[in-house]
A protein has these predicted regions:
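Metal-cofactor-dependent catalytic cores
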Residues: 2-305
Length: 305
């Protein structure tokens, strides 16, 4: 056996392998550098200022104004309050909103020291624990999509039924972290499969400008306020309907991506049907690309490339 020949062959094979590995490495490095330099850099353009942050813990309930909020994938959060994580349901589990019970918009739900505080006009405040692990989990429906909720108890049910002066029984449910969220793509195909919410109609975050509301209000017989449209983020220092063209936004440490316009059924009162034949689109729904913190007074930047 010629050991020198075997050694020479081994060296030759190692050189070929090294060349192949080195070539692959150069190719990968070249692709990475090419992507880096071919990709257009981001530009941040100032488009407005956050004038209000509003969280709606109870679906169709009264807004709670915030000075600062955490923006999670499923919407705004502040302490024990999370946006649209409580919901009124009928006995069959179907959601009850301001469409069915207009007085629901006057009900306030807040949290303090592990307790939920429920308030409404001409009603005594009702307090009950946020966590009630012994209560049953109810199967509920939001726009035909199944979702669960922890029943908040009989006392709360009696309070709601008395408030609405209803012959039917209403119950309050709470969405808990261990429960499976709704996939918004099941209702709106423009959403990605990974985008999820608890009890909102569709998107995690709704954004609207003061200028758009003022412009619209001037065209209506009875003026409207921002609160009527139930946004989470209200923007000032911009022109009417500028927000309709903001595809990607940076606010504080939060990055938002526009998904679709919001169908504002709230406008369709009998006196306004001469203006709108169907429910108009008003405000913009966003998903959360990057979670973080924002606050009133933060500058809003439009991201372009």
């Amino acid at each position: 056996m010629d050991l020198r020949k075997l050694a020479a062959d081994a060296v030759s094979q190692n050189k070929k392998a090294a060349l192949l590995i080195g070539g692959a490495g150069v190719a990968i490095l070249g692709f990475g550098l090419g992507y880096k330099y071919l990709r257009k850099p981001e530009k941040a353009v100032r488009v407005g200022v956050v004038s209000q942050l509003l969280i709606h813990p109870l679906k169709s309930g009264k807004a709670v104004p915030l000075a600062l909020a955490e923006c999670q994938k499923m919407g705004l959060k502040f302490g024990e309050l999370q946006d649209r994580h409580w919901m009124v349901v009928a006995e069959d589990g179907h959601m009850v909103t301001g469409r069915q019970e207009p007085r629901l918009v006057l009900v306030s739900l807040t949290c303090e020291g592990g307790q939920v505080c429920l308030n409404g006009p001409n009603m005594e405040e009702l307090k009950f624990p946020i966590k009630q692990p012994d209560n049953p989990i109810l199967d509920c429906r939001v726009f035909g999509v199944d979702i669960q909720g922890r029943d908040c108890g009989d006392k709360v049910s009696h309070w709601l039924t008395d408030y609405f002066k209803a012959e039917k029984t209403y119950r309050l449910v709470h969405f808990e972290p261990s429960m499976r969220p709704r996939k918004t793509a099941e209702k709106e195909a423009v959403y990605q499969q990974f985008e999820e919410v608890a009890y909102p109609d569709f998107g995690a975050v709704m954004l609207l400008s003061e200028a758009s509301v003022k412009d619209l209000s001037s065209k209506l017989e009875k003026g409207v306020t921002v609160e009527r449209f139930r946004p989470n983020i209200v923007i000032s220092d911009c022109k009417p309907f500028d927000e309709d063209s903001w595809e990607e936004l940076q606010i504080g440490s939060v990055r938002l991506q526009r998904v679709m316009a919001c169908g504002s059924y709230r406008l369709c009162t009998p006196s306004e049907k001469h203006i709108y034949k169907t429910a108009p689109l008003f405000g913009q729904l966003h998903n959360v690309k990057k979670t973080g913190i924002f606050q009133v007074g933060d500058v809003v930047y439009k991201i372009t490339r």
